[in-house]
């Protein structure tokens, strides 16, 4: 077994990709290529800078080149379904896709963000089942987290977002959760700071599921005041680069338990790996490399 890329790639090697922007910070190529090499699988994983304008053409190109599959990240998660053939039940419910698999020319979209997030919490020893959470965000990752949390048994979810293009998506998420699960979901404007303070005070966990904290918003946070946090609160961030966002720095200063996005990235990636290869990712080995 060798990790030398020149010795691994042959005329039979299949390509798996990642499409997003920004993309150069991603640890997914390292994670998946190390896992492929460890298991002796003839795949290679590459990252491609792709936004809204290029998305349709890129999917058509990937289809024509018969890629085995690819991951999807911001800002493409909620738009790519238009160019696929099928969606998994979870992706249909969430309305977002972060993993595509090509089975004999049929492109199927999956979503693994929600299960990845909940698994990361469990691995870190945090139990939020039957309790209340407050989350910022209304994009693909935030939606997947909210719906999976509701399906898993979280009692109440308070969602905060700016009144932008994603706000309507959050309204749909609230409707789905309230109609299809036993969880109570509510939506608020992120500018309503007093409401945010109230919801955080009633929650066991506060989560940032937006891109605020990573480039080009590194050093920023949606939290208007540090005194909204308390020592017994869990504060999590889906951002993993930097590994300690401004939000997590503030949370640590307030004595909170914190969790960055590395665990979620690992476990959502492990599920995607299984979808493409029908093999389990060597998670313990990958943890040694990434953590």
Swiss-Prot record:
Q: Which HAMAP family match?
A: Shikimate_DH_AroE
Give the classification, highest ranks.
Bacteria, Bacillati, Bacillota, Bacilli, Bacillales
Q: Which residues bind NAD(+)?
A: 161-164
* UniProt KW keywords: Amino-acid biosynthesis, Aromatic amino acid biosynthesis, NADP, Oxidoreductase
Single Gene Ontology BP annotation: shikimate metabolic process
Q: What molecular functions are annotated in GO for this chain?
A: NADP binding; shikimate 3-dehydrogenase (NADP+) activity
The answer on whether this UniProt entry bears the keyword Phosphoprotein reads no
Q: Which residues bind shikimate?
A: 26-28, 73, 98, 113, 240
Q: What does this protein do?
A: Involved in the biosynthesis of the chorismate, which leads to the biosynthesis of aromatic amino acids. Catalyzes the reversible NADPH linked reduction of 3-dehydroshikimate (DHSA) to yield shikimate (SA).
The identity of this protein, by name, is: Shikimate dehydrogenase (NADP(+))
The source's domain of life comes to Bacteria
Encoded by which gene?
A: aroE
Entry's EC annotation: 1.1.1.25
- Provide the reaction this enzyme catalyses: shikimate + NADP(+) = 3-dehydroshikimate + NADPH + H(+)
> Can you state the subunit structure given in the record?
Homodimer or homotetramer.
The UniProt entry's sequence similarity note says: Belongs to the shikimate dehydrogenase family.
Q: Which residues bind NADP(+)?
A: 137-141, 214, 238, 261
CDD domains per the UniProt record, alphabetical: NAD_bind_Shikimate_DH
Matching Gene3D superfamilies: Leucine Dehydrogenase, chain A, domain 1 (3.40.50.10860), NAD(P)-binding Rossmann-like Domain (3.40.50.720)
Q: In which pathway does it act?
A: Metabolic intermediate biosynthesis; chorismate biosynthesis; chorismate from D-erythrose 4-phosphate and phosphoenolpyruvate: step 4/7
């Amino acid at each position: 077994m060798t990790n030398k890329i020149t010795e691994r790639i042959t005329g039979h090697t299949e390509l798996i990709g990642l499409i997003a922007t920004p993309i150069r910070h991603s640890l997914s190529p390292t994670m998946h290529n190390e896992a492929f090499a460890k298991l002796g699988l003839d795949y290679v994983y590459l990252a491609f800078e792709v936004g809204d304008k290029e998305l349709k053409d890129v999917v058509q190109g990937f289809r024509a080149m018969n890629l085995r599959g690819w991951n999807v990240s911001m800002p493409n998660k909620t738009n790519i379904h238009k160019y696929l053939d099928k969606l998994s039940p979870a992706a249909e419910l969430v309305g977002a896709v972060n993993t595509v698999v090509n089975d004999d020319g049929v492109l199927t979209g999956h979503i693994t963000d929600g299960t990845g997030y909940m698994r990361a919490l469990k691995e870190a020893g945090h139990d939020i089942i039957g309790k209340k959470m407050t989350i910022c965000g209304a994009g693909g990752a935030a939606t997947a987290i909210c719906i999976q949390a509701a399906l898993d048994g979280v009692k109440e979810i308070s969602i905060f977002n700016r009144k932008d293009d994603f706000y309507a998506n959050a309204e749909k998420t609230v409707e789905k959760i309230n109609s299809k699960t036993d969880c109570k979901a509510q939506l608020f404007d992120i500018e309503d700071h007093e409401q945010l303070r109230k919801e955080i005070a009633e929650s066991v966990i506060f989560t940032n599921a937006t891109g605020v904290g990573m480039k080009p918003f590194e050093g920023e946070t949606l939290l208007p005041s540090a005194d909204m946090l308390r020592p017994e609160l869990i504060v999590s961030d889906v951002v993993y680069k930097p590994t300690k966002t401004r939000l997590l720095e503030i949370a640590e200063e307030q004595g909170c338990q914190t969790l960055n996005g590395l665990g979620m990235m690992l476990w959502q990636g492990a599920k995607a790996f299984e979808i493409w290869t029908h093999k389990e990712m060597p998670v313990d080995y990958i943890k040694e490399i990434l953590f």
